[in-house]
Amino acid sequence: LHACHNRTVVIDAHLGERENKQLPVVETHGLRNIHLYEGEDWVHIRDAVGDLADKFLCLNDVYPKGFLIPKRFIGENIIHLPTIKTHVFTTTTGAMKNAFGGLLNERRHWTHPVIHETLVDLLLIQRKIHRGVFAVMDGTFAGDGPGPRCMTPHIKNVILASSDQVAI
């Protein structure tokens, strides 16, 4: 089990893991802490999923030359740890939106005009490359409004979990 962080245009991942109190959890449990864009190998999507790429609804149009995904994820079990919040493009976030951040690089914003089709393509990719996928959603606080950055927080004190990435 290891913790993985992507690169984002919103906040530095190193700052985020400190401010969100993720580092103490990683350290307490002796997990390897991996920043996917620092020394990790990435592979071309066609090398990872083969002919499945021909079935993508939109990613081939958005990325005509293809795109790279983290090699580390191939054959791995994945546990997504999303939070409950709204999103201006997808209505809500969750495990599927987590895959968006984990499988696509920082140019992923080019998929926003076709975000729902992108999430379907990412589900296909996850089913192909991961041995298992599970999500535990933190609903201690839930975000409402024009998220993910400008939300009104609400205390909800719930935790949701499922192997169904669409449901969670």
PLM feature spans:
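Extended, low-polarity segments enriched in aliphatic/aromatic residues
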Residues: L1-I168
